[in-house]
Amino acid sequence: MLKRASFVEVDTASLRHNFSAVKSIVPKDACVMAVVKANAYGAGAIKASEIFLQEGANYLGVATLDEALELRSHFSKTPILILGYSPNANASMLVDNDLSAMIFSLEQAEVFSQMALKSQKRLKVHIKIDTGMHRLGLEPNFKSIETIKKIRALKGLEIEGIFTHLSNADAKIKTHAKNQMKAFNAFLEQLLDQKIEFQYRHAYNSAGILSLCNGNENRLLNLYRPGIMLYGFYPSNGMKESCPTILKNVISLKAQIVQIRSVKKGEFIGYGEHFYTNEETLVGVLALGYADGLMRALGNRIQVAINNQLAPLIGKVCMDQCFVKLNNIQAKEGDEVILFGDKSAKANDASEIXALLNTIAYETISTLSKRLERVYI
């Protein structure tokens, strides 16, 4: 039984389909790291991870220690990589929970080494290389080769992987992404010349998987990191139009009408006088607000699906509630409203919502609050 009259519906068949789409694109002998950061982009990290592991994922990727610990409590043996920065103070928890960490400096590696030795354990690390994102990482040059040699000499560390991140592989013209891969491959080859090898070599996110697996840029890669495509979205609308791979929507945001009331002409609905009733108006109240992840700016800007009919979201979205106009809509209290997700029910999908707000589907779904229950179908 639901604890609230609003929830996130997650289509598990679509999760499986999208993972299969990844497997159909990457090389047959490749490993796959399912990226489940930000609560699996809103889908629920535990259940999504369980499904991806059942479908053949070799690794799970997250952004923070807390995300990794949540997964570790459910998956005791599964490899988990924290792709984001791990503060030195977290070193002991990384070691104690058998988590893999991203590193990008000798100083960080030395701290992790000391903590691993103190615990009489080994900490797995993946070295980040900056090939053009200019966010985190060692630069692919001779100095970094010397740094990697010093890191490899540290006791207590298992240098499991090396990786980079593509910043613009969803662009129509792939010059920058290909230049990044050219730099990464050249660096890997220089390391090989020095007899430095890694169990895992990875670079391709969803955009890379969808657009760069047909060339030879990935010839040295053996691990792939799908993220947004697992949840049914293409990294950009342009890529959706040009990509033959079919992805299926996973996430729908739903709520029930908890009260219907008639408001006379000449009244304001909600905070701030943002919707004026120029006629007698039938208003449905939903127990869903911006604290749940329904962005406040969507008030007076979208239509929602109710019984295969479209009704406007009116007034400003409140922290915990919002309003729909039900004039000429067949609806009753308790009926389900789809804020976004299921296109077959006439609802907007998350990418359309994002376009209205000059953002992306990633933000629309990953900001869905944990206080919303996830209902898996």
Swiss-Prot record:
Source superkingdom: Bacteria
Catalytic activity from the UniProt record: L-alanine = D-alanine
Binding residues annotated for substrate, in chain numbering: R135, M319
Cofactor requirements of the protein: pyridoxal 5'-phosphate
Keywords: Isomerase, Pyridoxal phosphate
Residues with N6-(pyridoxal phosphate)lysine modification: K37
Pfam family, one: Ala_racemase_N
Top-level class of the enzyme under EC nomenclature: isomerase
E.C. number: 5.1.1.1
Family: Belongs to the alanine racemase family.
The protein's name: Alanine racemase
Organism from which the protein derives: Helicobacter pylori (strain ATCC 700392 / 26695) (Campylobacter pylori)
